[in-house]
Structures are given as structure tokens and as C-alpha cells.
Amino acid sequence: MQKLAIVGGGISGLSLAYYLQNDYEITVFEKDKWGGKAYTQKVGNYLFEEGVNGFLNNSPKTLELCEKIGIKPIKADENAKIRYIYDDKLIKLPSKPVEFLTSDIMSLKGKIRILKEFFIKPVCEREESVKEFAIRRLGKEFYRKMMIPMLAGIYASTPEITSMNAAFPKLKKIECEYGSLFKGLNKLKRGGEPTGELHSFEYGMSEFINKLKEKTKANFVIKEIKDVDELKDFDKIVIATEAYSASEILKKYEKLSDLLKKIPYNPVAIVGLDFESITPKSFGILTIKNKTLGILMDKYIFPNRNGIRAMLGGARYSEIKDLNEEEIIKTALDDIYEIIKNANPKITWLKLHKNAIPNYSLSHQKLVEDIFTEAEKFNIYLTGNAYNGISFNDCIKNSFELAERLKK
Ligand SMILES: Cc1cc2nc3c(=O)[nH]c(=O)nc-3n(C[C@H](O)[C@H](O)[C@H](O)COP(=O)(O)OP(=O)(O)OC[C@H]3O[C@@H](n4cnc5c(N)ncnc54)[C@H](O)[C@@H]3O)c2cc1C
């Protein structure tokens, strides 16, 4: 049997090892924690996710993997359907797009502008930023009130530095196929509502990671790989790390290494907290201009969580990575007091990811194409959230597809 080295024990590396366990003799190298950004920290009675909060149940590959390894995801509480944005005051988000027209989230002028979306010509021949796309199709007010918080919540980024084509390829495709988002979503009978429901596991994402490892026949080694030459004994190599780590490991291939370095990352600090009483009972709150990008009301979403988490920084406030623990917690507490009027936490917990999430910047798709073409020249394979999809679901799907290629 051929020997395969997988560098990186996040969901991308681990799911790849699972899919290929009967085809290769596999060794997975991880420098830190199994699960990478999918890691649950237990602090007394509290479970705090260091990264991934959950996943939508609209990706067949993730659900299939859960079934194969024998773990049952749990659905988020009904409260998770209630979401807010904070724009000097808390505003409840409509749960269905039609409710936009009756809610007070947008001015009358803003609502009329949204309806004009039906008649805006599509732009398909060139790439656009999320900002350009949103203002062009839905207007400035929608852009400010919806896209700024959404980008912070999903990508820890800002719409002006994010590529619409790379970050939301499905929406871009709908625009180009149907001429308008509303026409397309209507034809697809989606009505613009989310296509899946949020799920996680009873004891957090680490429960899944541990089970996945348990069901995978591979050598799991805690070791930082500093140079690809350390893997000379293997027939095939997959790098499933962050792009900047891949760049370092592959430094001997200068052009490939330089291309990988071009994928920027945004920092995120996560502060776990609990207070005597917390409202609103909901999934959470996204902000438009605070240093805290959002507050996740974990205790109202999944069992055993008990606390809440504030997510700070991102591209909006990248200085977060240079603050010390005390300063980060103070920043979170100031925002929490402003937004939900809570003070004097019973507990505080902090995780700082200096390089949390890759930014899908303008030209990201071309950059990824160049990276993959260059890597293939050296028989090196890459997978992970830096390339073709940022979500937990995307990582599993992409590793499945790579596994199918490596089986051939
Ligand atoms: C704060 C935060 C919240 C998120 N929330 C969600 C969410 O709710 N839902 C969702 O779908 N997605 C979420 N994501 C995105 C999600 O984390 C990722 O898409 C996915 O978990 C990434 O998995 P990965 O295996 O590609 O990368 P990672 O999890 O980053 O794994 C890469 C691994 O490689 C290891 N490594 C790096 N260099 C080396 C080396 N030289 N040698 C050995 N090992 C090395 C690292 O230690 C790490 O474990 C979130 C991300 C963050 C940061």
C-alpha cells in the first residue's frame, strides 16, 4: 500500500484521512490540537467553542459522514431562528425576506430600493467586491444594515475587501442565470430563506472530531512539520494546514510558497462569558461598527453550553491581535455593556486566533487556480478552508472530492 502523509489535523485533514483509510497507509501530522478550529474547551460547567459553532444540515457529505461514524448531530433550539443586529439599538431581523417589507429595519426608501432589484442588469463578465454587488443590486441601506454585519459574522471581514464571486459563488450564479436574485430565488422556491438548519453535537464540535479520529485507521502524530523534505518517505503528500503554514512547509518551491503567502487572514478573539441574566433569548447579535463583531448566545442555542461568546476583531478591527488578554476582555465587556447592558460576568474565558479566517479577497479564485496548478507540478495536494469554501461543510466536501481523486 502507498504511504500518504497528511499535514494538518483540522476537519479537512481528518476527514480526508477517514475517506482514504482503506486506500493508503496514512500518517496525519498535527502540531497543536486535533480538530484545529473545531475544538471545544471545557471550563467548569461551560463548553466554549474555540472556533466552529455549528454547521447547516444542507450538506449531504457532512450528514453522511456523521452517519458513517455513528454520531448524531443535534438541532439548534428554536431560539436560534431569532437574530438581531446592533446599530446604536437592537433591531430584530426578519426571519423571512418578505417580512423585510413590514419590519422597521429599513426605511421606506430602502425598501423601495430593494424591490428595484428585479430590474437591475446582472454583471457577469467581471469580478465584483461584495460591497459593489450589494450596493448595485440592493442599495446602500441594505448594504450597510445587512452586508456589513453578515460579512463580519461569516468571514470576520468587510464587504469592500471580499470578492463576491469567491465568497458567495451561489448567489453570483443565481444573478447570472436568472438575471435577478429575487427572480432566481423565487424560481428555485427558496424565497431567500436559509437552506439548512443549524446543527452541532451534544458536547460540542470536539465530540465529532474525537469520534472521527476513533473511526479512522491512521497513525496520528503530534508533530510540527517545518519542511516538506521531512516527508521524503511518503509516496504522496497532502497539506491541509492554513495557507500561511503551507507556504512555510513548501518554501523550497519558491513560486508556490509565494502564491500561498498571498492569502491573507483576519484575526478573531473569542471571549466566553456568563452573567446572572442575559437577554435577548436568541441566536445572537451582529454589529455594524463595534469592535465586537457579534455576540453568540450559546446558552440559548445548544445544550451544555451555559455561556455566551463575544467575537472581536476581524478585518474591521485587526488591531485586536496586538492587545493583551486584559485589554481584549475589557474591549468585549465595554461592547457587551453597550449592546445588552450586562456587567460583572460570573466567568470570563479567552481564545485569540491571530490568524483565524482566510480572507477571500478580490482575485481569490484566480490565485487558488494558480496555487493548485503550481502544486500539481510537484505532486503536492492541498485542501483546507483557505481555497474553495470556508465552512465546516465545505471542508468536508472538498476533502471528499480530493479523496476521490487520490483513489484514482
Ligand atoms: C472563530 C471561528 C469560528 C468559526 N465558526 C464556524 C462555524 O460556526 N461554522 C462553520 O461552518 N465554519 C466556521 N468556521 C470556519 C471553520 O473553522 C473552518 O472552515 C474549518 O474548521 C477549518 O478546518 P481546516 O481543517 O481547513 O483548518 P484548521 O482547522 O485551521 O486546521 C489546520 C490544522 O493544521 C495544523 N497545522 C498548521 N501548520 C502545521 C504544521 N506545520 N504541522 C502540523 N500541523 C500544522 C493546525 O494546528 C490546525 O490544526 C469558523 C472559524 C473560526 C476561526
Protein language model features and the residues they cover:
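Conserved Rossmann-like nucleotide-cofactor binding loop
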Residues: 12, 34, 244
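Conserved flavin/dinucleotide-binding core of flavoenzymes
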Residues: 40, 94-98, 298-408
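Mid-domain catalytic core of redox enzymes
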Residues: 223-326, 334-339, 372
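Active-site/ligand-binding neighborhood in enzyme catalytic cores
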Residues: 89, 114-226, 231-233
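Dinucleotide-binding Rossmann-like beta1-alpha1 core, especially the glycine-rich loop
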Residues: 44-122
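Short loop/edge segments at beta-strand edges and connector loops
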Residues: 30, 75-78, 220-227, 384
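N-terminal Rossmann-like FAD-binding beta1-loop-alpha1 element of flavoenzymes
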Residues: 2-28
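Glycine-rich FAD pyrophosphate-binding loop
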Residues: 21-43
